Amino acid sequence: MKKITTIFVVLLMTVALFSIGNTTAADNDSVVEEHGQLSISNGELVNERGEQVQLKGMSSHGLQWYGQFVNYESMKWLRDDWGINVFRAAMYTSSGGYIDDPSVKEKVKEAVEAAIDLDIYVIIDWHILSDNDPNIYKEEAKDFFDEMSELYGDYPNVIYEIANEPNGSDVTWGNQIKPYAEEVIPIIRNNDPNNIIIVGTGTWSQDVHHAADNQLADPNVMYAFHFYAGTHGQNLRDQVDYALDQGAAIFVSEWGTSAATGDGGVFLDEAQVWIDFMDERNLSWANWSLTHKDESSAALMPGANPTGGWTEAELSPSGTFVREKIRESASIPPSDPTPPSDPGEPDPTPPSDPGEYPAWDPNQIYTNEIVYHNGQLWQAKWWTQNQEPGDPYGPWEPLN
């Protein structure tokens, strides 16, 4: 009997190990249903029952450059295979972003609506960077967040990040950032009284200690903290601990495994120290970034499918590490996602008369349409605007 029992236990362990190696981290298809409305209690992010919540997920890269990776299918894969429960849509303001091309907000809407359908949380990120002072485009920010909160304020999925990384020696919490937040937050609250708002802090969202000493009055505000494992270490962890001791709620809305440039590394040992630090303090986070860009913080390799279904070969060292970390802590039982089909498969019998199709227009938004350009037909594989057909890594697939 003892021998039979031993064999049975071994078989069970074998099945369990096989399952771990061949299924996903979590079937997070009921995250928001489970946690509901988020809020802040005693400096902690909590769900509608007052229980602590830790969100873990991915940030996009700039939507104006790598928006092809932000779509329902890729976000579903991240939820089902990686186990994410939050996704951050990084909409740059400058550098070809919203200020130059307001239509990029359509990709933000696509991400938000996908997150709502997938029942995960989503961060709408007003991604200031080279425009170091959030007040430069304050009026545009107010208009944008008025629109977003009016559209999505009734959904508990939504989190607003109103200033990604204020920076520069003349941009301080008390003189620039807090006054900016005190103008933008009421715009959101007019439409959405409850959802979480993340506010960036000085020195590229590192100076949470300054915000902690002079906090905003809104009860559901969190303060952004950003780090890159190859550059930032114990002194910044000490600043976070100080802020937490003052009762400030911290959200690590961007972090990378690389140096602060987004490249160099990958620094996995240092990243693990940070992962442990965040877990011990129940800090929510989003990793930078979901892109195939040739930099070490990118989660994907060049040529990766924009709609998910990524093989090990399509994940970068950073992406492999981050996926493993999210899977380790995902709290919902494993599922077995079906890799999505490639929406970019060309029509096997393209029409012979190009005259039936419109010429490519750089001002037009395309999602799956066919256009005529430079003597041939092209079909959009994902959302695109002002990206000319012909780039082998771009959104257009040749049909003839």
Curated annotation (Swiss-Prot):
Location of region: Disordered: 328-363
Any GO molecular function: cellulase activity
InterPro entries: CBM5/12, CBM_sf_5/12, Glyco_hydro_5, Glyco_hydro_5_CS, Glycoside_hydrolase_SF
Keywords, ordered alphabetically: Carbohydrate metabolism, Cellulose degradation, Glycosidase, Hydrolase, Polysaccharide degradation, Secreted, Signal
Catalytic activity: Endohydrolysis of (1->4)-beta-D-glucosidic linkages in cellulose, lichenin and cereal beta-D-glucans
Cleaved signal peptide residues: 1-26
Domain Chitin-binding type-3 span(s) in chain numbering: 357-396
One CC-aspect GO term: extracellular region
Family indicated by similarity: Belongs to the glycosyl hydrolase 5 (cellulase A) family.
Protein name, per record: Endoglucanase 5A
Organism, as annotated: Salipaludibacillus agaradhaerens
Gene name tied to this protein: cel5A
